[in-house]
Structure formats: C-alpha cells, structure tokens
C-alpha cells in the first residue's frame, strides 16, 4: 500500500521535539510498518496551499533531524505545488458549485493521513479536519470558493464559529474529495495549548472526529460565556512572522493581521474599540521572498 502524510506547513503547530507532527508521524509510521507497509511507499507532503512552498530548512525544522534524514535523501518529502498541473487532479464541482482540484499524490495513495491541529482560527473556527485538506492541498479555484468576500462578509463569519458558511464549505469540499477518491482521510488532530503542547489527540474520520476536538478546544479558545467588553487592545507586530519574515512591517499584511485579531476577539470587544499596535516600520518588506 502507498501512504501519503499530509502535514501542515511552518505556520502552525510548534517545532519542539515533542510537537504533534513529530510524535504523530512516528506513531503512525510504527503502525503502518507493523501492518506491512514498506518505507519506500511512504511520502511526506507539506500542505502549504497557496502559502510559499516549504523550504528545506523549514522541512527539517518541522520534522526534526531523524524523520528528515529518514525520508529526504530518498526524495520522499515534498511540498504541495498548486501550479504543478502534472500533480493535480480535477475532481469537478461539489453540489454547491465549488471547483475542487486536488493534489495527485493524495488522490493516488491507498491511504491519506491528515496530521492536523485543532487551533483557533479566524477562518472557520478551527484549523485541522476538513479545513486542512480544503485549503492545504488544493488549487486557487478551490480556495476561491471560501477565502473570498462573498463568504467572509457574511453575518455568520463574525464572531468566529464552526457553523459558518466558510466551515460548511471546508466540510463539503473535504467530503467531496473522499467521495471522488473512493477513500476517507484518516485524520490525526491535536488540540493544542498556547505553547503548542498537546492537550488532546483525536484520530479517525474527520466528519466524526472534528466535533469531538472542538468540544475540548472550546474550553480554552472561544469563551462563549464572556460578558465583559474591552475598549482597548494593545499588542506588538513582530518582524518575524509565521507566513514569512517581513509581514510585521508591511502595511498591507499588517492590516490583514489586524483584521484577523478583530475576528478572533470580536466576542469580547466593544463596538468602537481601539487597537494600539507597535511595529518597527523600518521599511523592510522582505522583497526577496514576497
């Protein structure tokens, strides 16, 4: 059997020796090898979606030296390329009209494993589950069905929730992929704390596993019971940013980051609250990457 691990990029999840990606991949490999899967039939695929493709140093940081050396020299680590049409499969349209174009490595594999994180996210409530495959291993046409004003300006987008139209689209696209592939994703998602440590790990079919993860994550992420509203928010904008260094000084990307904070904290913000944000603003926008 051939197996593809779908792994989040550098944006989320932590890189400590006990990070979810490092621990979960190794645990899954042990089970796969015990079941007769051969190492040569395993591929590690970073699910960067439309983010910059994972660099080799990022791959090594995320996986750790042991996993990296185990698979990289034999060409068994790669990063999703949303413009490489030789490695994309057009699955057609969901009943709701979303165009789904999927990574071919995932489509062709006998087993597709999503290693994900249940972390609070302004887009659809939480990362992980079907959000992982709908955003990480598709094409701009697929992503343009949900990361667009028609979805993000709806009344159900703010405050953040798992019942928004955006979340529904993630689920619809993910289940449509499963239907067309003829197999279900095996999801292994960790609910993480502020330091990216595992609080709880849930594995199985995303449709059944997501709500279980959300129940635990809700206890620390979205304080539905909060009553007090705040007038002022103060925070610093880092130069080193998880999407790429330089975002904290680029005014366009700064505004995107600010709007995400509004979405995240809307439940506890006064209607006319003020954001005070410090930034170096030294003019470095990291042009060599962006």
Place the predicted regions along the sequence by residue.
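Short glycine-rich or small-residue beta-strand-to-loop segments that form or flank ligand, phosphate
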Residues: 2-16, 43-50, 234
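Histidine-anchored nucleotide/phosphate-binding helix
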Residues: 14-37, 257-268
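Short internal beta-strands
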Residues: 36-49, 274-280
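Short, conserved secondary-structure transition motifs
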Residues: 43-57, 82-87, 196
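Acidic, Ser/Thr-rich peripheral helices and adjacent loops at domain boundaries
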Residues: 60-74, 286-290
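Conserved, well-structured core segments that form the ligand-binding/active-site neighborhood
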Residues: 68-229, 236-239, 257-262, 267
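C-terminal catalytic subdomain
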Residues: 246-290
């Amino acid at each position: 059997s051939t197996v593809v691990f779908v792994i989040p990029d550098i944006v989320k999840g932590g890189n400590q020796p006990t990070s979810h990606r490092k621990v979960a991949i190794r645990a899954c490999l042990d089970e796969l090898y015990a079941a007769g899967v051969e190492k040569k039939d395993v591929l590690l695929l970073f699910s960067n979606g439309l983010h910059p493709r994972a660099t080799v140093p990022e791959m090594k940081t995320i996986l750790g030296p042991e996993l990296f050396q185990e698979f990289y020299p034999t060409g068994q680590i790669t990063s999703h390329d949303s413009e490489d049409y030789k490695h994309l499969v057009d699955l057609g349209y969901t009943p709701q009209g979303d165009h789904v174009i999927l990574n071919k490595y995932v489509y062709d594999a006998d087993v597709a494993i999503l290693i994900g994180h249940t972390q609070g996210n302004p887009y659809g409530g939480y990362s992980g589950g079907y959000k992982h495959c709908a955003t990480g291993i598709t094409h701009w046409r697929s992503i343009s069905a949900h990361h667009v004003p028609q979805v993000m300006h709806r009344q159900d987008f703010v405050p953040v929730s798992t019942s928004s139209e955006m979340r529904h689209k993630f689920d619809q696209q993910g289940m449509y992929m499963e239907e067309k592939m003829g197999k279900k994703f095996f999801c292994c998602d960790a609910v993480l704390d502020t330091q990216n440590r595992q609080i709880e790990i849930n594995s199985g079919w995303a449709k059944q596993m997501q709500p279980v993860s959300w129940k635990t994550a809700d206890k620390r992420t979205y304080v539905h019971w909060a009553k007090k509203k705040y007038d002022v928010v103060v925070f610093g904008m880092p130069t080193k940013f998880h999407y790429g260094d330089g975002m904290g000084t680029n005014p366009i990307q700064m505004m995107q980051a600010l709007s995400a904070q509004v979405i995240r904290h809307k439940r506890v913000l006064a209607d006319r609250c003020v954001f005070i944000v410090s930034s170096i603003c030294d003019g470095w926008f990291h042009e060599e990457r962006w």
